[in-house]
Amino acid sequence: MGIDRFIGIDLAWAQSGARTKPNESGVAAIDGHGVVIECGWTRGLDETMSWLAKTAVDGSTLAFVDAPLVVDNPVGQRPCEREVGQRYGRWKVSANSTNQSSPRQAGVLLRERLQESGWAYDDGRGGPPTGGLVFSECYPYTTLVGAAELGYDQERPTYKRRPARVPTARWRAVRAAECARMIGRMEGLTTADPPLLLSSHPGSRQLVSEPSPQKAADYKHLEDLIDALLCAWTAALWSRHGLARCQVLGADSSLPPGQAPTIIAPARPEQRRDRGAR
């Protein structure tokens, strides 16, 4: 047995209203050789579930989702989110707080839909799965600074949030340039273990061949696809190397195996708890 397909979903966290068009979610699927099988966008949970049904390999798929999947805390921040800041704060990476009062619960709804469809949520505390239809939570920022292959040794790339040092008037141009550099680093994963071959699919190839847009809506469109590809590659990294290259944030939960709210995150030695990262 083994996992043959790795899926990444950059999920739009908020639910759409009756009169509101759902926001886009980025979706991507790669195989064990890094070939991009499919990538693009969906709108709403129904489209995302339909895409998964067409893209997953039955009995051999691992999906990583960038969205809170298990939210059991009435207030405050989930422990796994707190640990993001504790372990990766030096690289200027932190996580938004999620609790049962948060309006953005699309990840919880996706988990419920997936479980109803035969998928199994895996909190990662038992190591990588060896088969089945399995999904877990990840956070692309931890991949960017936790995977040494990408070269972000000092701090995260500024492709999302404007740093205070960048004037608002210059932000769109600075962001587009930073995004282009990040795509260049992702293109370098061709020789990584596991690899990611951006040139293997027209959608991901376009990231490399065309300049990053400055217009806000166009940029968000591209950003969602980038994050989905990072999620898929993180799933492949976890499957290939397990705890040797990744850590499970929130692993101290007292919940039964497979039920804890966790984030599976690539980690350098200095980002791990047992190396003084707290």
Q: Which residues does each PLM region occupy?
A:
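RNase H-like (RuvC/DEDD) metal-dependent nuclease/polynucleotide-processing core
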Residues: 1-7, 11-278
